[in-house]
From Swiss-Prot:
Modified residue annotations for 4-aspartylphosphate: 51
UniProt domain Response regulatory: residue ranges: 3-116
GO MF annotation list: phosphorelay response regulator activity; transcription cis-regulatory region binding
The protein, known as: Response regulator SaeR
Modification comment: Phosphorylated by SaeS.
Signal peptide limits: none
Length: 228
């Protein structure tokens, strides 16, 4: 269920927005206080509707605090500020949309529905490139480069490195690597992963790439992580 935070110092606006969005199936948290809104900021919030003109803490302040906390929450401003420079400033802060009062609650619902649909499409697009300092992995062409210089790798070596790197800092078992990269059971050839990881390490070390490494976590598997 999508969690929406509505912040507006006008209680009637908060109430009507809450009614419309709950009818659409949203989980809705509301507040009429910008100060309280800051205390509600968290990764649990999927999207926000913010007024701008509020006493003490305004809608701009909330977004600046969100960025200070390194939270990435999409937000739409709902405001009576109608001048072009207001809209431009809001968009400069990163607003995903800008709705001027008086407004249609149904239109606001549709705007947020459309925004979330676009976000889902974006997040479901396959990642085609990974970068870790000087190291770059390009999935489409199965190419690995260090400082722009191509590192020759066999297909399975690339696929193994890609799988580990795309799950950075996660310990991945040998059986999972065999299943996902080679497509067969662990017991068929337990040494396959060891051999390929040894080759990958050698090739990266030959290019003097040492800022990231594939660490052996004894008894558990392997982890791609920044070197300690």
């Amino acid at each position: 269920m999508t969690h929406l935070l509505i912040v507006d110092d006008e209680q009637d606006i908060v109430d009507i927005c809450q009614t419309y969005f709950e009818y659409e199936g949203y989980k809705v948290t509301t507040t009429t206080s910008g100060k309280e809104a800051i205390s509600l900021l968290s990764n649990d919030i999927d999207i926000m509707v913010l007024d701008i003109m509020m006493p003490e803490v305004n809608g701009y302040d909330i977004v600046k605090e969100m960025k200070r906390q390194k939270l990435d929450i999409p937000f739409i401003y709902l405001t009576a500020k109608t001048q072009e420079h207001d809209t431009i400033y809001a968009l400069t802060l990163g607003a995903d949309d800008y709705v001027k009062k008086p407004f249609s609650p149904r239109e606001l619902v549709l705007r947020i529905n459309n925004l979330l649909t676009r976000m889902k499409k974006y997040h479901h697009q396959p990642v085609e490139q990974l970068s870790f300092d000087e190291l770059t992995l390009i999935n489409l062409s199965k190419v690995v480069t260090v400082n722009g210089h191509e590192v020759p790798m066999r297909i399975k070596e690339f696929e193994l490195l890609w799988y580990l790197a795309s799950r950075e800092n996660e310990v991945i078992s040998k059986s999972e690597l065999l299943e996902k990269v080679w497509g067969y059971d662990y017991y068929e050839d337990a040494n396959t992963v060891n051999v390929h990881i040894h080759r990958i390490r050698e090739k990266l070390e030959k290019e003097s790439f040492t800022t990231y490494t594939i660490t052996t976590v004894w008894g558990l598997g392997y982890k791609f992580e920044r070197s300690r």
